[in-house]
């Protein structure tokens, strides 16, 4: 039995806990002394997101680097902003689908100036099932063992269904865009052909009149 591409991608998406790269737990990146580094993630609407970050002072100096961190929505709304920190956690629930941006920069002011020329940062996006604190759920609802695993598996199954439906909607949307684009290209092609035919006929008639006037034919 063949597995459709949509189902295959959905299963990979679930296996990664909301990411298309299941083996990646965190992103390691270098933030320069000036400017900022941004990381983006495509996230659906109504998804719980937890972003953990920590900067590493590889020089082990007392004046270690600190960060300015901000997270923005697809429409540019600031969901999280903090300055002069070495680590932290941003948590929010998405209200729209799209590209969410996390930007980091080294903090500089008169009271704190790092001797580092750059800083290494560990950045970990957790979404949906991965963002859920199952230990807290187990304590709050007093469930453990097999019952907890069944609860977790049920939510994973619901996530699979939601992700597959989302991917199917995106697939249908992209197919509609492609069909509209193809239709417009065909229309423009026919218009161009019509214009070329009209111009060619006009040129032939003009040349015919010219040759008749000059009595060349």
From Swiss-Prot:
Keyword match Transport: yes
List where this protein forms a coiled coil.
Answer: 138-160
- State the UniProt keywords alphabetically: Coiled coil, Endoplasmic reticulum, ER-Golgi transport, Glycoprotein, Membrane, Methylation, Protein transport, Signal, Transmembrane, Transmembrane helix, Transport
- The residue spans the entry assigns to the Cytoplasmic side of the membrane are as follows 208-217
What are the GO BP annotations of this UniProt entry? Answer: protein transport; vesicle-mediated transport
InterPro entries membership: Emp24-like (IPR015720), GOLD_dom (IPR009038)
**Where on the chain is Omega-N-methylated arginine found, per UniProt?**
170, 175
Give me the glycosylation sites of this protein. Answer: 84, 116
Main subcellular location of this protein, as a coarse class = endoplasmic reticulum
Positions in the Lumenal compartment = 27-186
Record has Iron as a keyword: no
Q: Which GO CC annotations does the UniProt entry carry?
A: endoplasmic reticulum membrane
Q: How does it sit in the membrane?
A: Single-pass type I membrane protein
What does the UniProt entry say about where the protein is found? Endoplasmic reticulum membrane
Signal peptide span: 1-26
Residue numbers covered by motif COPII vesicle coat-binding: 210-211
Membrane-spanning intervals of the chain: 187-207
Record motif COPI vesicle coat-binding, residues: 210-217
Boundaries of each GOLD domain copy?
Answer: 36-152
Q: Please explain the role this protein plays, according to its UniProt record.
A: Involved in vesicular protein trafficking. Mainly functions in the early secretory pathway. Thought to act as cargo receptor at the lumenal side for incorporation of secretory cargo molecules into transport vesicles and to be involved in vesicle coat formation at the cytoplasmic side.
> Family assignment?
Belongs to the EMP24/GP25L family.
- Domain remark in the UniProt entry: The cytoplasmic C-terminal domain contains a functional dilysine-retrieval motif, which is involved in the retrograde Golgi-to-ER transport of the protein.
* Subunit note: Probably oligomerizes with other members of the EMP24/GP25L family. Associates with the COPI vesicle coat (coatomer). Associates with the COPII vesicle coat (coatomer).
Under what name is this protein listed?
Answer: Transmembrane emp24 domain-containing protein p24delta6
Species whose genome carries this gene: Arabidopsis thaliana
